[in-house]
Every structure is written in C-alpha cells, then in structure tokens.
Amino acid sequence: MGIIQPGNPLPTIHLKDQDKNEVDLTSLKETKLLLSFHPLAWTGVCQRQMEALEANVEALEKLNAQALGISVDPVPSKKAWADAIGISITRLLSDFWPHGAAATSLGLFREADGISERAAVIVDGEGIVRFVKVYPMSEVPDIGELLETLKAL
C-alpha cells in the first residue's frame, strides 16, 4: 500500500491518548488536524517534534487546528513521556494495538522496523487529507511550514 495522497478522505482511525481517552479522528471534523507521526517516544528528535507542537498550541487554535502526536508506543509510555517532557495540552496518541494500524492505514508504517515514518498529515475540516510529507528520521518537521499549510486551507 502506498502513502495516502492529498484529496483522499482520512480513513476511520480510533486511538487512545496519553490519558486513556478514546479518540475517533473522523469525529473531529470541522477542526483541521495535524497528525504528527513520530517513530518512538523517549528519543531526542521525537521529543523536539512534540515540543514544537506544544509550543504552537495557540497558533494552531487560531487556525482552527489541532495537532496530535502519534507513535506505536503504548498508552502508559505516552503518559510517562508526556509528563517527563512537559506536554500537557497536546494529545499524544498510541498506535500500539493493533500494532501500527493507524500508520498502516495511511501507508506510513515501516514494517521491517515496527515503527511509523516521521511524517506530517494535514486533514481539513471535512476529513479530507490535504498535505502529506515524510521526513528523514533525523529531521524535526518544520512547524513553520506546517502552520503555513494549515493557514492556506
């Protein structure tokens, strides 16, 4: 399966956040979504990626957008990591079981490694994917570019 392309609807995805709340991504319509996939918690680049989301919560709200951090880590790990790095507003979603199902549904799962790509997927308020970018594992996604993309929607 290839990577989801702009113009396609976001598939049905249900995940739990770091506080064990069920999140149905398709129910978040009328809000733009920035799905920020990161390979694993407890790694430096992933930490900087999530800190960039947290630092831009107000900017995202002004754009009627919400950022969600997603990785294959289990919920307790997401909770401990969020607490350790000071993430208190941004929801960190667990794609742990079925392992990598959300990433797989978007064509972003690295089967050989058991993790997702580092990627950003932007979804408009109608549930349509409008932007997809896969980043090198060593690179923090450019939050400025992502905010500009959201602003243009």
Model-derived features: where do they sit?
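Chalcogenol-based redox active-site neighborhoods
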Residues: 1-153
